[in-house]
A protein has these predicted regions:
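Juxtamembrane intracellular "pre-TM" segments in multi-pass secondary transporters
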Residues: 9-18, 196-229
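Conserved MFS/SLC helix-loop-helix module at the cytosolic interface between two early adjacent transmembrane helices
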Residues: 72-110
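Helix-to-loop junctions at the C-terminal end of transmembrane segments
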Residues: 74-85, 274-287, 376
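Helix-loop-helix hairpin linking two adjacent transmembrane segments in secondary transporters
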Residues: 112, 142, 149-196
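C-terminal transmembrane helical hairpin of 12-TM major facilitator-type secondary transporters
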Residues: 289-334
């Protein structure tokens, strides 16, 4: 591995040479493990609350703080990848994430668990360092394929996290899930340290100047603002659903355990499978049409969940599964299209553009988790469905609103 541990230049001498498959697999797996850490708790909320002696509303703050920490970490930590060796940042974050997960598994109280959840969210942003690292390492001729593979790993991490955590919590307890996750991240961190090259900093801007440039990009590019706002609104409904699903299934009329809640994560396969398909449509027809179709799918799916409450229990459950497949497909397709829009705005600021998009996305998720737990506590499941449907309608309205097209930002980026 010594031949790939040298400081890496973003402009490789052999633009058609392929990145070694084991390294691509390592990056993809590590991104999946990192992002999975912020979703493990969602199917386990029912057993976590019972095990630690916390109310549904209190334990519902676990995913809220995790998502908030993730958004905060993207905003405050992700820009450092342009200033310092990205390999060192990734490995340090992996160590911090492993420790935060271990602390969560050993938390003696709900207060300690909430602190651990915030730390997990902050450190899990190493996934957002791995994706631009993959783009930098990949030769231009294969960059799209490499980044697509890493994004597939990230999406599968989201998918499998809920399935695995629901199963482990049901059979070994929720604390075991956090400890196993800690060990997996630690192993990935060692592999990344040994397998990745060092990266040359691409700027000498101070930390304050890096953060300040985010505001400049936000003010300058209307397409960035629209993409971020629409994805944030869509994420409100996405997170409101996933952060309350386990509690809803745990109660009447279903009385199901963590395994059932985690199994709903299999519906996320639709999102992972939709990623390359959505990308192809965005390339041929423009990302704009993908964003509109994706948000429309989410609206239809969430509205159908409300109608499903009128059906018998078994039919209700089947309709809920089908609607989960549809809305997850819509959300993930819209995200891929928004990334296509954002990455095409300014090639020299893609990392910071990506940070802004994902800050908005995970701010929406944190808001959705908070509002979802309040809606469930005060209005029941139907209130959660109304919240998710309304936020998705808001996302569609943002995408339908005509956009200004400044000279530095061709309107063609969003046509279709």
């Amino acid at each position: 591995m010594s031949n790939i541990r040298k400081p890496h230049d973003a402009s490789p001498e052999a633009p058609h040479a392929r990145l070694p498959a084991p390294l691509v697999l390592l990056l993809s797996t590590s991104a999946g493990l990192a992002v999975a850490s912020i979703y493990y708790s969602q199917p386990m909320l029912g057993v976590m609350g019972a095990g630690i002696g916390a109310s549904n509303q209190a334990v519902g703050q676990v995913p809220t703080l995790t998502q908030f920490g993730y958004a905060l970490g993207i905003l405050l930590l992700a820009p450092l990848g342009d200033r310092y060796d990205r390999r060192r940042i990734i490995v340090l974050k992996a160590a911090a994430l492993a420790l935060a997960l271990l602390f969560g598994g050993m938390a003696p109280s709900i207060a300690a668990l909430l602190v651990a959840s915030l730390a997990v969210g902050l450190a899990a942003t190493l996934a957002q360092d791995i994706v631009p690292a993959a783009a930098t390492l990949a030769p231009p001729a294969h960059r799209g394929a490499v980044v697509g593979t890493v994004m597939t790993g990230l999406l599968l991490g989201i998918l499998l996290s809920r399935v695995v955590s629901g199963f482990v919590a049901e059979h070994l307890g929720w604390r075991a899930m956090f400890i196993v996750a800690s060990a997996a991240v630690a192993v990935a961190g060692v592999a990344l340290w040994r397998g990745m090259p060092r990266f040359k900093p691409t700027t000498q801007l101070s930390y304050g100047a890096l953060l300040g440039s985010l505001g400049h990009l936000w003010r300058r590019h209307g397409s960035l603002r629209r993409a971020t706002l629409a994805q944030a609104l869509l994420s409100v409904g996405f997170s409101a659903f996933w952060s309350t699903l386990a509690l809803m299934l745990h109660g009447a009329p279903f009385h199901l355990g963590s395994t059932a809640a985690g199994s709903f994560g299999l519906a996320g396969a639709a999102g992972a499978l939709a990623a390359p398909f959505a990308g192809r449509i965005a390339d041929s027809r423009g990302p704009g049409i993908v964003t509109r179709l994706g948000t429309l799918l989410a609206i239809v799916a969430f509205a159908s969940m409300g109608l499903a409450t009128l059906a018998p229990v078994h039919l209700h459950l089947g309709l809920l599964v089908a609607a989960t497949v549809v809305f997850d497909l819509g959300v993930q397709a819209t995200l891929i299209a928004h990334q296509s829009i954002v990455y095409g705005i300014d090639p020299n600021a893609r990392s910071r553009m990506n940070a802004i998009l994902f800050v908005g996305m995970f701010f929406g998720m944190a808001t959705g988790a908070a509002l979802g737990s309040l809606a469930l506590a005060h209005g029941g499941w139907i209130a959660v469905v109304v919240l998710a449907t309304g936020s998705s309608v808001g996302a569609l309205l943002v995408r339908l609103w005509p956009a200004a097209a400044p000279a530095a930002q061709p309107r063609a980026l969003e046509q279709g």
